[in-house]
Amino acid sequence: EINNTYACGSNAIQSHRIHKDRPNNIIVLDAVADEINNSILRAGHVTFGLSASLNGSGTAIDFNWLKENIRKLSDEDDEKTIESLLLRERIYVEYLNQTRVYALKDGGKKRFYAQRNSWIKAQYYSLFTNIGNLPHAIFSGNFDYADRILQWFIFPRTILLGIILLFGTIMVFFDWVACVKWWLLLFCLLFTMALAIPNYLVDDKFNKAMKAIPVMAAGKIVNFLFGKKKK
């Protein structure tokens, strides 16, 4: 299917990555996060005519283009650098939902927090290196590129949920009328995420992993704020 899509003129293709096994809570939540991204940032974007987001694996890119641009890749995050280079040139990233790539991941806590910390830093590195191009992308009609830059403004989901919950709780004691909008925003975000999770992931493992989210979210925030970056 990838070859057929390439033959039809697509120079950048993202397949559907799925976790092969879910042995612990970390891998279960990682699988859920992947599928939420697949539903919103890939399948959803393509449905509305926007370019799909790259996933870091299961990606096929035209070899000649990659050969010309390989030296431009950043040490911070190759995936987002490739994505920004593609979108600057208005190269559309196609998403193949039915073409599945099965992945195995290390589920250790140290690796989990280190990886999330690295992703967050890479996101804002990409934002700061591309934000200057946002006005030109908008006014030149390069909406795929503009959309991706705006995405990098948004906090990661775990941190975003924590911020909304914190403000909602604080406002209860100061202005209960104003706090309604925060709880409504939290409900809308959770509802959107729930819709994006496929049925095959909702099982006993999922229910068990949901109970571990508060502890993991707190650890993620602490690690991001105080964790030392490995050289």
Residue ranges and their predicted role:
Residues 83-102:
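Catalytic donor-sugar/metal-binding loop of nucleotide-sugar-dependent glycosyltransferases
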Residues 130-142, 171-175:
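Hydrophobic, membrane-facing alpha-helical anchors
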Residues 33-40, 113-134, 163, 216-227:
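Catalytic core of nucleotide-sugar-dependent glycosyltransferases
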Residues 75-82:
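Acidic donor-binding loop at a coil-to-helix junction in glycosyltransferase catalytic cores
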Residues 3-75, 124:
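Long helical/loop segments within the catalytic core of UDP-sugar-dependent glycosyltransferases
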Residues 138-158:
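Loop-to-transmembrane boundary segments
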Residues 151-230:
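Membrane-embedded multi-pass helical conduit in multi-pass membrane proteins
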Residues 104-121, 205-208:
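Nucleotide-sugar-dependent glycosyltransferase catalytic core
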